[in-house]
Every structure is written in C-alpha cells, then in structure tokens.
From Swiss-Prot:
It comes from Prochlorococcus marinus (strain NATL1A). Keywords: Oxidoreductase. This is 15,16-dihydrobiliverdin:ferredoxin oxidoreductase. The gene is pebA. Catalyzes the two-electron reduction of biliverdin IX-alpha at the C15 methine bridge. Belongs to the HY2 family.
Length: 238
C-alpha cells in the first residue's frame, strides 16, 4: 500500500526540478530490532521550497504509512503542504489527511490559496469528514478544507489515488499563483511562522509514540527533532 503514491509524488518532485539530498544513514533507513518494521526517509531540494521531506514506514499488515511535508522558501508565503496516510491492513482501515497548512487564518490569505482545496473537498465526499482531534488545535496550521478520510479498502483503492493526484496538481498551481502575486506575509514573518510550525508539530505530533514503539524512544526523539521538525530546535526570537 502507498508505493504507487510514493512513486507519483517522487515523479512530481522530479518533474519540478527536485534533486535528492543526502539523508544521514540513521534516518535514511531504519529497521526495528524485531525486524518487523522498516522506515525510509528522503529529503529533496526543490526550486521554490526551503525543505521537502518524505517518510515511508512499512510494518507489513500491521501498518503502512506515507508522510510528506513541503515548506516553501521564506520569500513565499504559500501554505505548507502536508500529507499523512495510514493503512491498517488487518483492520482494513484507512486514515488520510491531505492539507494546505495555512501560515495564518485571515480571510485574504485563505481566499488567495484555497480555492483548489475547497473544490476538492466538495468533489470527494469520502474526504469530507470533519477532523476532530484531542491532540491538535484545528484552527492552528490546519485549513477549514483539510481533506480527511476514515475509510476502508474501497476508499484506499479507488478514491485515494484520484484525490492524491488532484491534490498535488492544486498545490503546484498554488506555487505558480504565489509567483504571480505579491506576498501577503513578509519573508521574515514567514521564517518565524515556519519555526513555530515545527515547534508546535514536534510537541503535538502523535508519530513520536508510533516511532518509539518500533525504534525506541531515543531514536524517535532524535528523528522528530533532527529530521521531521528541525526548526523546533531554533530560537524563535533569534
């Protein structure tokens, strides 16, 4: 599960001039001590982006994960792209979130960047669920039009591939849109908001518990802070 989507994402990145960056060996591939789970990580240098990372976790029929986050460069105030897909084979359960994660929640910013996502949410009822969370504040770094699905094999096999392709196309359109318009947020503020995003995510992301169960707490903390959310180590006032 998700290998075809990973290939599509990789193809998209390459078509937009992406080049692979070196990932430290300890993060590039990690296998659990029990040998029942493998994690692979990729980091991309993509024109227009400060950082683009991808994670693929394969725990067999227990769990499959595809996660990707793309941070535009500081001169671009467009939303951060977030993809988080989980498949539980034994339970035949899909949990999927795809979102353009807004740096701010004001109307002018949302009107500029979210027409495409609004349209997708209307077009795919299966991904029109309300995202309720005891972990995240849905008004902080999530859009009102986040594509969220709790489904089964039908959604995983038939709906997810379609919405995944459309989602990526919409995000690339946002990149073109951002180049044609003056930023709504100044670059210095964009940098600060990216740091805040990483700090918030490093604290809230439930993946830490998941990784700890497979790879141990020490490795997981290092992976969270050094690979997934490295700006969480920055001083936001510096």
């Amino acid at each position: 599960m998700f290998n075809d989507l990973l290939s599509e994402l990789t193809k998209n990145i390459l078509e937009h001039g992406g080049k692979k960056l070196i990932v430290p060996n300890e993060f590039c591939e990690c296998v659990s001590k029990q040998g029942n789970c493998k994690l692979n990580s990729w980091l991309w240098d993509v024109p227009g982006f400060r950082r683009w990372r991808v994670t693929r976790l394969d725990a067999g029929d227990r769990l499959q994960v595809l996660n990707s986050v793309a941070y535009p460069n500081e001169q671009n105030d467009m939303p951060i792209m977030g993809i988080d897909l989980l498949w539980f084979e034994k339970k035949q359960k899909l949990v999927a979130i795809l979102d353009f994660q807004p740096l701010v929640q004001d109307k002018e910013y949302l009107d500029r960047y979210f027409d495409g996502l609004k349209s997708l949410k209307k077009s795919f009822n299966e991904f029109n669920s309300d995202m309720k969370s005891n972990i995240y504040d849905p008004t902080k770094y999530f859009s009102p039009w986040a594509l969220f699905c709790k489904g089964g094999n039908f959604e995983a096999e038939n709906i997810l591939p379609k919405i995944f392709s459309s989602f990526l196309k919409c995000y690339w359109k946002n990149l073109d849109l951002s180049k044609a318009n003056e930023n709504h947020i100044k670059s210095q503020e964009v940098s600060i908001l990216h740091i805040d995003y990483d700090k918030y995510s490093a604290e809230k992301d439930p993946a830490h518990g998941l990784f700890s169960g497979f790879f141990g707490k020490e490795w997981s903390e290092k992976y969270m802070k050094e690979f997934l959310f490295p700006l969480s180590l920055e001083n936001i006032n510096s």
